Amino acid sequence: MAEVLVLVDHVDGAVRKTTSELLTIARRLGEPSAVFIGTGFDAAKEALAQYGAEKVYRIESADVTDYLVAPKAEALAQLVGSASPAAVLIPSSAEGKEIAARLAIKTESGLITDAVDVQPGEGGGVSTTQSVFAGSYTVKATVTKGTPIIAVKPNSAAPEAVQGAAADEVVEVTVSDGAKTAKITDRQPKAATGRPELTEAAIVVSGGRGTGGDFSKVEDFADSLGAAVGASRAAVDAGWYPHTNQVGQTGKQVSPQLYVAAGISGAIQHRAGMQTSKTIVAVNKDEEAPIFELVDFGVVGDLFTVLPQATEAVKAAKG
């Protein structure tokens, strides 16, 4: 059974949920092998084994860890050359997609980004599903050249724990001078909000122009659900919420199990960032709002009335 490489997404050895999802997907395609770049492997090993990693390639060279994405792509390209994997799975984050693109060029392979499903292809290979053209179409695709390089959106699979050996192998890589032109000079930890990361959250509650700048009801409802908080571009441009929380074509793309849009009209730019959500709920006073065209459930009403009622109902259900 051919190896399937999974690039580990972690912070100092704390493995993110996206990695357990990718390891679960990798088991559909072959034998999962994790690629761990950076420090903190001892803390990560158990989590990688828990979700089926049979092997872990460790890349700890400062030439890779002290620079931005280019050395990581070079290291992966060398590993692809030696391991000849059936596919490479990478988280579809901003950094992940850049690594994937560089890797595809270096290995002369086909690239698929923002996949929301990955399955074995008919007659071999890999088949993916993704949303394209600002969410206007859902398509299936396969890579026809080289090693399939696939960037997968968070929440594309439910993590399934299966014990793996996680036998580690230290990999020595050579990084070209051309890849070391952007050095990391400082790292600042992100301030904790008490809420899940927007792109990884299973539930996202977003507010738009309809909030009038008051996100308190959106935040209260999100907190009752253990959800992340998002915002439309209109709300961000008005200065009501940080750009780091913007969902849409020029913000972050999310694909949670549940997406709640409160006071958001549903312009195509916003839909491009959330249309692959598994279940979509909208709350809007305007019954003609475009957002109602793609929702699973819609509530025509004032979010300042609807959301507090929903928050109390959630709290009551939790006891």
Question: For each predicted feature, which ranges?
Answer:
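N-terminal glycine-rich FAD/FM-binding segment characteristic of electron-transfer flavoproteins
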Residues: 1-319
